[in-house]
Amino acid sequence: WNEFIAHCKKGGIEHIAIEEFPGTMVWSASTLLKLREATDPMLGINLDPSHMMVLGADPIAAARALKGCIFHVHGKDARIERGLADTDGLLEPRPVTESADRVWNYVAVGCGKDLQWWKEFFSVCHMMGYDGDVSLEMEDLTMTVDAGVNTSIDALRQTISQ
């Protein structure tokens, strides 16, 4: 990491945003903070709340723990499927195309967590120092792409403070 960071700095790069993802080296707030402490504060997080949701973590609590380390944010939601997750837990080996049988699914923004939750999430990200863009990631296979994008954009417009 230190060689990579030195190379990035030589190239004029000021920040590296690592997206936390289950099963990788950086999958939580604590793993990002540990890597950052061992290397350089130019490393921060590309905060994807859906990835924390499917692990059972609280993205709002994570945003608070990551004060000053949030370099980018995704607008991406996930839904824990009632009944299925209750019996099988959150570990999901099935492909995303088998949405009817999965214990969780990526869904359009507002179709997992409600709009009040999203308002709080974006508010906390802002309070913790993030004032950048939000990237919409649309991976909802329970509706058409157009419906998912439109649903997500509508939800994001209602929840991101201007």
Residues covered by each model-derived region:
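Active-site acidic/histidine proton-transfer and metal-coordination neighborhood
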Residues: 1-44
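A generic secondary-structure signal
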Residues: 7, 34-35, 124, 155-159
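Alpha-helical elements of Rossmann-like donor-binding domains used by nucleotide-donor carbohydrate transfer enzymes
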Residues: 3, 31-34, 120, 151, ...
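Hydrophobic faces of well-ordered beta-strands that scaffold small-molecule active sites
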Residues: 16-18, 43-47, 71-75, 132-136
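C-terminal helical cap(s) of enzyme catalytic domains, especially alpha/beta-barrels
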Residues: 145-162
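Gly/Pro-rich active-site loop or hairpin
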Residues: 29, 33, 53-130, 146-147
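Active-site beta-loop-alpha junctions enriched in small/polar residues
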Residues: 19-23, 48-52, 76-80, 137-141
